[in-house]
């Protein structure tokens, strides 16, 4: 039987209002997910870097509980939480195989609204 290290994928969705982190296996099945609202933060406190720090600590605890050794990280969004989350996961001793930014960038998508004339 082939021995392999258990792998996982972390999706970090960071907006200006919230940070959502999802831990999945290689096939895309969700193992655990956390957001600032789950941890008890409401309103403007959800967008702080402290909330994203607690989210990433919870994710690293669940990675260690599930015996995951290798992690791929996908980051989406422009919020404050992505750098904090990356730093904490990197310092936890988990091997990060790749970090990919999947933030959608429009290539001149929808037409802008007309300018307001006063």
From Swiss-Prot:
GO function term, MF aspect, one: structural constituent of ribosome
SUPFAM superfamilies found in the cross-reference section: Translational machinery components (SSF53137)
Gene Ontology terms: biological process: translation
Stored PROSITE patterns: RIBOSOMAL_S11
Spans through the membrane: none
Keyword presence, Manganese: no
A Gene Ontology cellular-component term: ribonucleoprotein complex
Presence of the UniProt keyword Secreted in the record: no
Source taxon at top rank: Bacteria
Matching InterPro entries: Ribosomal_uS11, Ribosomal_uS11_CS, Ribosomal_uS11_sf
Record HAMAP family: Ribosomal_uS11
Name recorded for this polypeptide: Small ribosomal subunit protein uS11
